[in-house]
Amino acid sequence: MDFIKKYLYVCDHPGFFELTQETFQNRWFPAQINLSVDVKCLSLMSEADVNFYKYLFTFLGMAETLVNFNIDELLVDFECHDIKHYYCEQMAMECVHGKVYFNILNMLFKNNLAATWEFAEAVLKDEALQKKLEWLESKIKMAKTKAEKVLIFYLIEGVFFISSFYCIGLLRVKGVMPGVCMANDYISRDELLHTRAAALLYNTMIPKEERPSSEWVVSLFKEAVEIECAFIEAKTKQVTFVSMDDIRAFLEATADRLLNSIELPRYYKSDPPQSCPLTYTGCIKNVSFFERESTEYSSFIINDL
């Protein structure tokens, strides 16, 4: 019977079943992102701005693989069909994100792969990124229990990339890079779903008696907010439209939302900035994905026999 339960699918987690269905409905593909107008926008941007976004997309492109490694390690601790099915879908979407980031980098570096790799080598040695990665590595090593591992994963999903998405969203405010902005909408929407999944994993699969103290969790989030602020602040000198006050407020509001989602009180009690450029992160613009033109987002199955 144990063998049958392990290999014969039955719905064993309605919450993750629903998230998997939502992922199916929200599927999209790299070919849907048209960067032809974005190429022309490069000449409208300052050198400092272009270099900043090269840096962000190089970081994000490499980070997608890191997330999939973390998922592989996390799933070892859970025997649940619906959890595994959901995370298979999430890993597939992370691969889509990685391909889109490659296409964007290809556009930014004008199809010069050697220049892209050379730039990526420099990014890996960058002090701001090193501090961020060292902090994250220390927290991953520190996480011994299942609860701590899930919390670190939740933190990665919810905080580790969010200030980068915010800065990319500012391109829309500048009136440039429509394809990149659309990709950022799709990806930030996906990452919101991934963050909801990590919260669901913690809330439903980690018994309350096994969870760390609220003080421990809040301390972890406070450190993450400071690390993320320092990461962006180090790279945004001379970059237009970036306000560190707004980014800090956004990060604090995001941390509060994440804490609330795992049944803990808000710590910062901050509100996101009114000018928040992100559509799908639950910060200020409550626009439903399905209220946008469905033809922009949906793939249609033709002659499906």
From Swiss-Prot:
It comes from the Viruses. InterPro entries: Ferritin-like_SF, HSV_RIR2, RNR-like, RNR_small, RNR_small_AS, RNR_small_fam. PROSITE patterns: RIBORED_SMALL. Gene3D superfamilies: Ribonucleotide Reductase, subunit A. One of its GO terms (molecular function) is metal ion binding. It catalyses: a 2'-deoxyribonucleoside 5'-diphosphate + [thioredoxin]-disulfide + H2O = a ribonucleoside 5'-diphosphate + [thioredoxin]-dithiol. It is found in: Host membrane. Its EC number is 1.17.4.1. Heterotetramer composed of a homodimer of the large subunit (R1) and a homodimer of the small subunit (R2). Larger multisubunit protein complex are also active, composed of (R1)n(R2)n. This is Ribonucleoside-diphosphate reductase small subunit.
